[in-house]
């Protein structure tokens, strides 16, 4: 099953948690001190909020898929359309280990295409982001990943 992924950076986690729980009509799927996630079935959405980012609002969008092969298919489809991006293998981010392919749309919105392999106890900070976190990649003008991102 594919899910649209939406990640919002918030100021007040508890206030936002209460709002989105009411909006979705369900309790969160995952709750941490700095991160909350809902896996909504109708519509199929992986919705997450987190603190720690100085800029509030939309952090990034994404497509969550069922396999590494599906991530590879997305990567190939995007590359065939002339869209360059960055692979991230075994990324530790948002309390999960995932295979990812990050791209940026023509308006600068970051898209995280990914398959989660397992849940983790660590929020982020893998070597791909220079140990600075995850979830908010920064692309240079060439469309390549910069290690300046953080959650």
Where do the PLM segments sit?
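Conserved beta-strand in the GNAT
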Residues: 46-50, 112
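A short, sequence-level motif marking secondary-structure junctions
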Residues: 51-55, 118
């Amino acid at each position: 099953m594919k899910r649209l992924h939406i990640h919002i950076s918030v100021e007040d986690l508890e206030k936002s948690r209460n709002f989105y729980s009411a909006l979705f009509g369900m309790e969160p799927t995952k709750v941490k001190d700095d991160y909350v996630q809902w896996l909504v079935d109708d519509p199929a959405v992986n919705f997450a909020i987190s603190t720690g980012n100085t800029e509030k609002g939309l952090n990034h969008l994404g497509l969550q898929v069922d396999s590494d092969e599906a991530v590879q298919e997305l990567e190939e489809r995007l590359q065939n359309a002339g869209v360059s991006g960055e692979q991230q293998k075994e990324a530790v981010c948002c309390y999960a280990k995932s295979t990812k392919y990050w791209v940026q749309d023509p308006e600068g919105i970051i898209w995280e295409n990914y398959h989660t392999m397992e849940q983790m106890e660590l929020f982020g900070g893998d070597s791909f982001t220079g140990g600075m976190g995850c979830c908010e990649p920064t692309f240079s003008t060439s469309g390549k990943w910069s290690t300046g991102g953080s959650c």
